[in-house]
From Swiss-Prot:
One of its GO terms (cellular component) is cytoplasm. Transmembrane segments: none annotated. Its main location: cytoplasm. It catalyses: tRNA(Thr) + L-threonine + ATP = L-threonyl-tRNA(Thr) + AMP + diphosphate + H(+). GO terms for biological process: threonyl-tRNA aminoacylation. Belongs to the class-II aminoacyl-tRNA synthetase family. SMART domains: tRNA_SAD. This is Threonine--tRNA ligase. It comes from Acidithiobacillus ferrooxidans (strain ATCC 23270 / DSM 14882 / CIP 104768 / NCIMB 8455) (Ferrobacillus ferrooxidans (strain ATCC 23270)). Residues 242-535 are annotated as: Catalytic. GO terms for molecular function: ATP binding; metal ion binding; threonine-tRNA ligase activity; tRNA binding. The gene is thrS.
Length: 644
């Protein structure tokens, strides 16, 4: 007689084994209608799974995070079923869940067209209406291989052969479609429906360019149609904000294919913004007690063996280069360089904490298919910092880091966060004592800062717990940004030491910390967050002076000179064009303030001020305009509201 404990602590007892769906119905008809899966003693399972012994069970509903995962996974299977029903020659490979959706890779002799996607999506909706039961079956390794060989599914056979012997194999049937899968899945195809196929891309089998090219169909799926509609609206808004298009229009940056993919060229306008970002970052770090470092771009290959990168990270590193019999490699990270500086002399406990920061360019060997504008590149500048401290200083240092993170991100207009605390995984280095103390220090620092967070149990790196922070942009998207990572591994690998109060040699704690993640990616996020309409303190051109005719060019230049001497990024448009044309041109350039001058302004020593939204701010003296722009720039104001 199974005794089932529910999340609220209540119990349900049954005279005989029951399925998850039976349990859901016993709790309530509404819950049963919303149910898509269940967690049994923490393990996600199908609703059809039998509960034949005592267990803690939570019914998973369609609108929960687990529920969305199951819906998206099941929709990927629905996609594969639809493709094979329309194109029997297509072979299925893999179809995982990704952020906000799913994809499925197919071996198909030609590329899928937009018309194909329409037909596939229509077929998927027809299969939903059929409300086909989704059934799980267990097979032996031999039977599974025989089944998929008979079906001509070569890729599935390859996958099965790679699975360790003795590991249970399951497949799922819905109608005449069969797929190898661990599950779980929705009870029937009728549960699905709020989905949209989005695009097709090429993808190599197993991500290896030596393997066949597959056709990858991307889609999104949601619990309800209203959620899908909201997401598609967000995508449409995101398309308007695409940093690649805006970056080209505003001449901020480019990717030059003649030089290679994933390598960013900063144009003059983008370089101005970058300089503002970096100057603020440096100023904030110096105020917070950091010293700034500069380190090389390459190092002996042996250094990367010492750090462990050659063992655990070599696929993301560019190949070594040879010089006089010595192998060098581009750095994928800055940490070993900071450690070498630390080891240049012996430190006392009184020297700690040591806080070092660097805007260091690193290089990652990203696959070409993964590259995406500024968001995924091969060469980028990390806003890297490392704190070397004693165990008793961890909490205070993490607290100080969180203060700095919020100060810097808040200045750019980001004040809504999603925070995860990732704890010790199964395989790790370091004693129980140091892990427990360090994890508690991170908790305490978060709670003292009044920050809400979720615990990602077992999600930490093998060398220490960490805090990850995502920022939310203007249209509600979340971007991984800041990371605070404790490291018990590198100090040991590099034999780092400090002299403790009792004279003993001890190993310091190392804190890795980035706030932006990378300058390039953060700039891409900024472009999309502001839709290229940077606040005045970030704008590459803060004000442009527009004479209504060439007769006022000299006066316009004198106005610009006054502003430039105040440190304002001002320009003058002396083209022989109508004033309406100039206003439109610089509005499209997203210049915050347009200063129009003619006879009246020249006589009075004034300018007519308007913002890029077309609001008339009145006629003001040159000094008043300069003082206001200077004040807004120095205060790092994030709105267009005139502060005069």
């Amino acid at each position: 007689m199974p005794d089932i404990q529910l999340p609220d602590g209540s119990h349900r007892q049954f005279a005989e084994p029951v399925t998850g769906l039976t349990l859901a119905r016993a709790i309530g008809s509404g819950l049963a209608r919303a149910a898509v899966a269940m967690r049994v003693d923490g393990i996600l399972k199908d609703l059809s799974a039998v509960l034949d012994q005592d267990a803690e069970v939570a019914i998973v509903t369609r609108d929960s995070a687990d529920g969305l995962e199951v819906i998206r996974h099941s929709t990927a299977h629905l996609l594969a079923q639809a493709v094979q029903s329309l194109y029997p020659e297509a072979q299925v490979t893999i179809g995982p869940v990704i952020d906000n959706g799913f994809y499925y890779d197919f071996a198909f002799p030609r590329g899928f067209t937009p018309e194909d996607l329409e037909a596939i999506e229509a077929r998927m909706h027809a299969l939903v209406k059929e409300n086909l039961p989704v059934q799980r079956e267990m097979l032996s390794r031999e039977d599974a291989i025989a089944l998929f060989e008979k079906m001509g599914e070569d890729y599935k056979v390859e996958i099965i052969r790679a699975i360790p012997r003795g590991e249970p194999l399951s497949l799922y049937r819905q109608g005449d479609f069969v797929d190898l899968c661990r599950g779980p899945h929705v009870p029937s195809t009728g549960v699905l429906g709020a989905f949209k196929l989005q695009r097709v891309a090429g993808a190599y089998w197993r991500g290896d360019s030596r393997n066949p090219m597959l056709q990858r169909i991307y889609g999104t799926a949601w619990a309800q149609q209203k959620d899908l509609d909201a997401y598609l609206q967000q995508l449409a808004e995101a398309e308007k904000r695409d940093h690649r298009r805006i970056g080209t229009e505003l001449e901020l940056f480019s990717i030059q294919e003649d030089a290679g993919g994933g390598l960013v060229f900063w144009h003059p306008m983008g370089s101005r913004v970058r300089r503002v970002i970096e100057d603020f970052w440096k100023e904030a770090h110096v105020e917070a007690g950091y010293d700034l470092l500069y380190t090389p771009h390459i190092a002996h290959e042996q250094l990367w063996y010492t750090s462990g990168h050659k063992d655990f990270y070599s696929e993301s590193m560019f190949d070594p280069m040879q010089d006089e019999g010595q192998a060098y490699q581009l750095k994928p990270m800055n940490c070993p360089f900071h450690i070498l500086i630390y080891k240049d002399k012996l430190h006392s406990y009184r020297d700690l904490p040591i806080r070092w920061a660097e805007l260091g360019t690193v290089y990652r060997h990203e696959m070409s298919g993964a590259l995406h504008g500024l968001m995924r590149v091969r060469g980028f500048t990390q806003d890297d910092a490392h704190v070397f401290c004693r165990p008793d200083q961890i909490e205070a240092e993490i607290g100080a880091v969180l203060v700095l993170v919020r100060k810097i991100l808040g200045t750019f207009g980001f004040d809504q966060y999603e925070i995860n605390l990732s704890t010790r995984p199964g395989h790790s280095v370091g004693s129980d004592e140091i892990w427990d103390a360090a994890t508690q220090a991170l908790r305490n620092a978060l709670e003292r800062a009044g920050l809400e967070y979720q615990v990602d149990a077992g999600g930490g790196a093998f060398y220490g717990p960490k805090i990850d922070l995502k920022i939310q942009d203007a249209i509600g998207r979340k971007w991984q940004c800041s990371t605070v990572q404790l490291d018990f591994n590198l100090p040991e690998r590099f034999a780092m030491e400090y002299v403790a109060e009792d004279g003993a040699r001890k190993v310091p704690i190392m804190v890795h910390r980035a706030i932006f993640g990378s300058i390039e990616r953060f700039f891409g996020v900024l472009i999309e967050h502001y839709e290229g309409k940077f606040p005045v303190w970030l704008a590459p051109v803060q004000a442009v002076v527009l004479p209504i005719s060439e007769h006022y060019s000299e006066y316009a230049e004198s106005v610009s000179d006054v502003l430039v001497k105040r440190g304002i990024r001002a320009e003058t448009d002396l083209r022989n064009e109508k004033i309406g044309y100039k206003i439109r041109a610089h509005t499209l350039r997203r210049v915050p303030y347009l200063l129009v001058v003619g006879e009246r302004e020249k006589e009075a020593g004034t300018v007519a001020v308007r913002d890029r939204n077309g609001q008339d701010l009145g006629t003001l003296s040159i000094d008043a305009v300069g003082a206001t722009l200077q004040k807004m720039d120095q205060a790092r104001v994030n709105t267009l509201e005139w502060q005069g």
